[in-house]
Structures are given as C-alpha cells and as structure tokens.
C-alpha cells in the first residue's frame, strides 16, 4: 500500500478550508482588487501541499488571505491577515541558532523553524509594510520579520508592529521571545 502524503488534507478538511478562505476573500475585497476567487480555488485544488500550508496558517490563527497576484509567475500571494500576530505562533525566538544559544528558559521553538515546517516564509520588512497598507495589524502584538544576514551574524533580529498609527521596525537579540511576539507567514500559490 502506498504511503499517504502527510502534507495532504482530507477532502472534508480541504472543503472546510476552501470555504473559510472563500468567505474571507469575499469579505476583504480591498486586499485583492481585480483578483477572481475561482482562479485561485482552481490553483489551490491542484496544489495539495499549498493547501496543507494554508491550513497550517489557518489553524495557528493566521487568517490567511490573498494580498496580490504576481502576473509574471501567475502566482497568488497569501499573507497572514489576523489582526494580531498569530496566537499559536508566539513566544518563539528568531531561529535555530538563537534557540540553541539559550542555556535555560528556552522557548518551545523558533520562528524560522516553525515557518519552514509549515511550508511558508516569514514576511520581509517590505512585505510587512505592504500588509499594513491593507489594514491596521499588530496594534497590541509584534511580529518577527526576515532579518538580513549581516544583522543576524551580530546576534540581532528584526521585528515590526504598529503603534501611534505608524509602522515601526525594531531590533532585539534573536534569542529573545515574548508572549506578544509571533510571526506572519507568506505563501505563493
């Protein structure tokens, strides 16, 4: 008997996820003007691994939604669009090196490792700022963002939030973790 791909949803779960994504898409048309749901759904149905990743985004509180369409590659771009940093992805340090450097009081995991396991990428600063043009996010929380290697080599990592109606980018030690800091993911389909 062939081994079943563990990154594939049951038909019931797939239909439930597609329904949630469709409803969110229809409710937030300002995020994706000129994009048609039927084309996205057809691509999703043909991409079991992408659906699995979107389900990971959904079940961890990310509320993924379409935020763009790359006409060159014909890929639809999903970001986590939850009002606050996804609840089930908080209290994480930045990456594996930061996690391994902690001697005690280690967090359960790192943002980079969790994102990789989910099959998504952490938003860059540019992507985070694009997201903030679509609404007001992270008013009470903050989100790790992809950190340039020169900053990371020196032990730092970057995160963003929105306060005083302004998007801020900050630095912190990569090994730090907070109950109000998570990460937002990006997936291309």
Model-derived segments and spans:
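A binding-site-centric feature that preferentially detects glycan-recognition modules on secreted/surface proteins
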Residues: 2-121, 125-189
